[in-house]
């Protein structure tokens, strides 16, 4: 999994981890901040929140166009500094008046613009690391590792936001409203770490930027290693656009984690947990489980006795920690609806080595699915996740009929959502990192930035469509109908991918 990866991958992945940690720390409390600080009603706060998300995923298109003209490295650096200014403005406690609202709006625009310049272009740089022949066969596994790094940042972000806010309230005696700004300040600090890593280890990926630097300095066009004809370029762009169309519906379904799945957690899922199940709601226990997984892989792959010994020590220590936590459980723990969102990034981090190892083994025996086939399989698995939700929702009352008055005895087990997030994570691992890898591999070199930007543009459209199941929820649709629509969309998308699989495989 970790072998034969370019050194530049680790530098770019860690830089991205720092940026994503800051982004998700801000995002974890932003909606609550809008209501607590400005008193916005839920509809207005949600509109601001969703519009911001859409901007975050649409602006990489502009970032890609700019990078194709000015260079990826320059745009990544510019993006980090613009984001920093945005988070800095957001971290200032300016009050609740019109000036504060205007400042918040400006900060959101800066954060979205900076993300647009940074996010997609950094991934293009990762893709170019694998243009070298000795690394080409590890492109998919490399993007899986890069994607895992994103989720490491996301995994700890909500806890960081909550902890820093509580510390500010208890130690500094600041108000709840002002404590949100401390969470935004964490995002500023994370960007400082991110830019430090990006520059300190630039020697590991400087060859990726060498060609574009030469082109700018010498004022001579850089000849592409494999020039494409107009027909080949057109075919590749068409294939990518077909994949982008499918990606829209994946993110529409997947990002229900912050919409209908969270509503289901609030209205239909048990609010307390005890015994072994309750351990899943402590992120430190999930991290220990991740160490067990990685320790097992280290034990299997280490070629020296020292390496195997270290791996075994990690496994024993993690299991001992889990046993200690289990033996000291005291009664039931409260389960809040947002806590379920910690499972997805934890699953991604834990399952990435499993995914990489599985496909590496399939590659060795000549049975590995192609990138387009993996995308199609991802849509099928996503459909299965919502079929599972439909099965678990049988017999439950309609959303508006039940609302929030359900008693603990009539609520379903938390295991339904925990298992659903697991299924959706399998789908995500098949589609998201593989899809990004596919774009970096297939995109015509002179349109690489634009194509990566369009990937994020498709994600943005999917984010906007997330509201449709929410509208169905509010219109008193049956739960099975809501999950059925999502399952059906994923299934149709999968069938579409497999219907054009030969065309997609030809360009990949």
Label the predicted regions.
Residues 79-99, 319-327, 377-406:
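C-terminal ends and interior cores of transmembrane alpha-helices
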Residues 3-53, 251-264, 322-333:
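Helix-loop boundary and gating motifs at the non-cytosolic
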Residues 66, 126, 164, 358, ...:
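Hydrophobic alpha-helical transmembrane and interfacial-helix anchor sites in secondary transporters
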Residues 17, 86, 99-121, 398-430:
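Hydrophobic core of transmembrane alpha-helices in multi-pass small-molecule transporters
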């Amino acid at each position: 999994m970790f072998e034969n990866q370019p050194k530049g991958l680790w530098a770019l992945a860690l830089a991205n981890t720092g940026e994503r940690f800051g982004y998700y720390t801000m995002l974890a409390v932003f909606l609550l901040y809008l209501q607590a600080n400005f008193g916005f009603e839920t509809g207005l706060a949600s509109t601001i929140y969703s519009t911001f998300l859409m901007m975050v995923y649409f602006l990489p298109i502009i970032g890609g166009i700019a990078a194709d003209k000015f260079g990826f490295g320059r745009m990544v650096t510019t993006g980090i500094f613009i984001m920093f200014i945005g988070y800095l403005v957001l971290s200032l406690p300016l009050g609740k008046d019109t000036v504060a609202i205007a400042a918040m709006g400006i900060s959101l625009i800066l954060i979205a613009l900076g993300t647009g310049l940074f996010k997609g272009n950094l991934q293009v740089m990762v893709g170019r690391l694998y243009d070298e022949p000795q690394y080409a066969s590890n492109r998919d596994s490399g993007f899986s590792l890069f994607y895992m790094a994103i989720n490491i940042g996301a995994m700890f972000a909500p806890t960081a936001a909550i902890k820093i806010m509580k510390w500010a309230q208890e130690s500094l005696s600041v108000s709840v409203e002002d404590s949100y700004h401390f969470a935004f300040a964490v995002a500023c600090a994370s960007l400082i770490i991110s830019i430090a890593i990006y520059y300190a280890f630039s020697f590991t990926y400087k060859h990726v930027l060498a060609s574009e630097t030469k082109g700018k300095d010498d004022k001579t066009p850089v000849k592409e290693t494999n020039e494409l004809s107009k027909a080949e370029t057109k075919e590749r762009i068409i294939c990518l656009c077909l994949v982008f169309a499918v990606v829209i519906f994946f993110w529409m379904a997947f990002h229900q984690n912050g919409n209908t799945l969270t509503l289901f957690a609030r209205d239909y899922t048990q609010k307390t947990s005890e015994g072994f199940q309750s351990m899943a709601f402590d992120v430190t226990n999930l991290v220990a489980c991740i160490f067990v997984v990685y320790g097992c892989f280290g034990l299997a792959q280490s070629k020296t006795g020292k390496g195997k010994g270290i791996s075994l020590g990690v496994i024993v220590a993690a299991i001992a920690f889990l046993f200690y936590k289990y033996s000291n459980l005291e009664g039931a723990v409260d389960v809040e609806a947002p806590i379920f969102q910690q499972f997805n990034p934890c699953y991604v981090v834990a399952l990435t080595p499993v995914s990489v190892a599985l496909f590496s083994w399939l590659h060795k025996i000549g049975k590995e699915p192609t990138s387009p086939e993996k995308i199609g399989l991802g849509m099928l698995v996503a459909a299965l996740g919502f079929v599972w939700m439909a099965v678990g929702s049988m017999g439950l009352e309609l959303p508006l009929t039940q609302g929030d008055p359900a008693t603990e005895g009539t609520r379903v087990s938390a295991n339904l959502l925990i298992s659903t997030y697991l299924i959706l994570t399998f789908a995500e691992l098949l589609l998201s990192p593989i899809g990004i890898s596919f774009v970096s591999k297939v995109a015509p070199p002179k349109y690489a930035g634009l194509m990566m930007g369009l990937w994020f543009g498709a994600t943005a459209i999917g984010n906007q469509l997330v509201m449709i199941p929410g509208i169905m929820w509010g219109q008193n649709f049956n739960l099975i109908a809501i999950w059925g629509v999502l399952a059906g969309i994923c299934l149709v998308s999968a069938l579409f991918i497999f219907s054009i699989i030969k065309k997609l495989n030809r360009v990949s």
